[in-house]
């Protein structure tokens, strides 16, 4: 049970780190959403905040559906499958090296809702352990022609509903809080928050410089190591 509480704290720390880093985008999106409720057509065509808010909603639908129906089946995924998923993620990330040749969409309004749905489906695939959520969503966004900065920002904006949903699903499994060691939660929360801030800044910096594909090498190496470890254990 303490492990479950620790996992929840990790999710919450990551959630808070994302909010801090992308607070301006979040505030503009929330503001645009409520203003757009008064005039949907005009806001959808002219208000960037509302447009992004609507895009976030659309992109969140696939992961909500997949997560709801498959969540209980994914916790015991075999180790070699996780290794293979990491290798798949790494391969896709490496392909983003050539996205500079793809015509870039000039602004948010050039991004179609079909594009957004594809990014949402990419996020849904990340319910499978070993598939990187940000890796998949940013990669697909780049393949679809979103500029690097917005691809990263949008990827982490749509992560917020997904992380919040994961928190809710985890909280329902908590039973007697009195039996938990709160120190686990505090350590997990602080650690994930601090490292989340550092990781987000580092990733966005690499992305803006066109070096996002470098993370593909990391995923490939870890994936191969996990798979080889599984083979070694299985043989012995």
Where are these regions (language model features)?
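Multi-pass membrane proteins that catalyze or facilitate reactions on polyprenyl-/lipid-phosphate substrates
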Residues: 1-236
């Amino acid at each position: 049970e303490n492990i479950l509480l620790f996992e929840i704290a990790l999710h919450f720390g990551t959630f808070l780190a994302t909010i801090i880093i992308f607070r301006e985008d979040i505030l503009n999106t929330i503001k645009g959403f409520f203003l757009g409720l008064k005039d949907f057509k005009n806001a959808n065509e002219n208000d960037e905040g509302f447009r992004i808010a609507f895009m976030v909603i659309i992109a969140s639908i696939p992961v909500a559906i997949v997560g709801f129906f498959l969540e209980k089946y994914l916790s015991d995924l075999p180790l070699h499958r996780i290794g293979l998923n990491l290798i798949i993620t790494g391969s896709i990330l490496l392909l983003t090296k050539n996205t500079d040749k793809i015509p870039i969409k000039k602004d948010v309004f050039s991004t179609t809702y079909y594009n957004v749905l594809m990014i949402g489906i990419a996020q849904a695939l990340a319910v499978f352990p070993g598939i990187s959520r940000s890796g998949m969503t940013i990669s697909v966004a780049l393949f679809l022609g979103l500029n690097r900065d917005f691809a990263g920002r949008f990827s982490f904006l749509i992560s917020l509903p997904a992380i919040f949903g994961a928190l809710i699903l985890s909280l329902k499994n908590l039973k007697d809080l009195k039996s938990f060691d709160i120190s686990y939660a505090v350590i997990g929360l602080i650690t994930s928050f601090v490292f989340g801030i550092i990781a987000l800044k580092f990733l966005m910096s690499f992305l803006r410089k066109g070096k996002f594909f470098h993370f593909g090498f990391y995923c490939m190496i870890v994936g191969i190591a996990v798979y080889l470890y599984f083979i070694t254990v299985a043989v012995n």
